[in-house]
């Protein structure tokens, strides 16, 4: 119940439908009942379409909110927007800077994860997240909710789903598969460019969203990965070694 798979005939239709989720969420927002969306970097093709739709419709976003899902961490703090892979930079350049200033939400309504996670976590209170969008990584993550390292108390078995679901926004060490994927998709194959840590939204915030929406155009995880997580979610087969299955 509550889980469905939607197929699109063309990439154009796919990314337009993804962009419309932003618009549909923001249309519900009012000053008394603000509404937002939590969105990914990967995919990104929808972002310029979002800006174009907002401008064409003349949709005021003054009360609307946006949460970034994650950001790179350089070992000391979040990377700046000068970093070539900065997610905040991508969101702003591909979407928000393209929205007419008269329509754009105030900067205080844009929430990007930082090394000090408290302001980001607090921003989820009092605002409705209509939808959390995401992609699926090779390691079966959403955001950077990778499988936890198999060491210490998790050496012989991964954490129980109920334990993993307690995790909130946090700084994480990234799985080697995630590093390789981002080098391939974003770094031109240069794995040394990819930070080994990140700040990610957690299951705690994910479960505050009214809906979780995962978009897969075939450029990130493999067909096998898509079929695997679809099967696990539809059958209620939950295992924290496959983080996407926790969405069941």
Where do the PLM segments sit?
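N-terminal glycine-/serine-/threonine-rich phosphate-binding loop
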Residues: 1-37, 55-56
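Ligand-binding beta-strand-loop-alpha-helix segment within the catalytic cores
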Residues: 1-6, 59-133, 192-193
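ATP/nucleoside-binding phosphotransfer catalytic cores, i.e., glycine-rich phosphate-binding loops
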Residues: 3, 8-10, 18, 200-248
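Gly/Ser/Thr-rich loops at beta-strand to alpha-helix junctions
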Residues: 37-47, 135-141, 219-221
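A glycine- and small-aliphatic-rich helix-loop capping segment at beta-alpha/alpha-beta transitions
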Residues: 50-61, 83, 146-158
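Class I SAM-dependent methyltransferase SAM-binding "motif I" and its flanking Rossmann-like core
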Residues: 143-195
């Amino acid at each position: 119940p509550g889980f469905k798979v939607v197929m699109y005939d063309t990439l154009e239709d796919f990314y337009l439908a993804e962009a419309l989720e932003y618009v549909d969420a923001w249309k519900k927002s009012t000053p008394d009942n603000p509404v937002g969306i939590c969105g990914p970097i990967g995919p990104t093709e929808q972002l310029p379409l979002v800006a174009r739709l907002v401008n064409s419709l003349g949709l005021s976003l003054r009360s609307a909110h946006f949460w970034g899902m994650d950001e790179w961490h350089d070992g000391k703090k979040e990377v700046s927007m000068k970093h070539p892979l900065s997610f905040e930079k991508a969101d702003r350049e591909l979407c928000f800077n393209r929205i007419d200033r008269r329509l754009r939400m105030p900067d205080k309504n844009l929430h990007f994860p930082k090394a000090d996670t408290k302001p980001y976590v607090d921003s989820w209170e009092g605002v409705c997240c209509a939808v959390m969008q995401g992609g699926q990584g090779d390691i079966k993550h959403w955001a950077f909710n990778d499988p936890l390292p198999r060491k210490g108390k998790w050496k012989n078995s991964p954490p129980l789903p109920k334990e993993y679901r307690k995790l909130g926004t946090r700084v994480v060490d990234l799985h080697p598969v995630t590093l390789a994927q981002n080098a391939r998709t974003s770094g031109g194959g240069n794995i040394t460019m990819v930070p080994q840590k990140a700040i990610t939204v957690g299951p705690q915030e994910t479960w505050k969203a009214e809906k979780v929406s995962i978009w897969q155009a075939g450029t990130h995880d493999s067909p096998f990965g898509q079929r695997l997580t679809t099967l696990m979610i539809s059958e209620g087969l939950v295992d924290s070694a496959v983080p996407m299955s926790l969405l069941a």
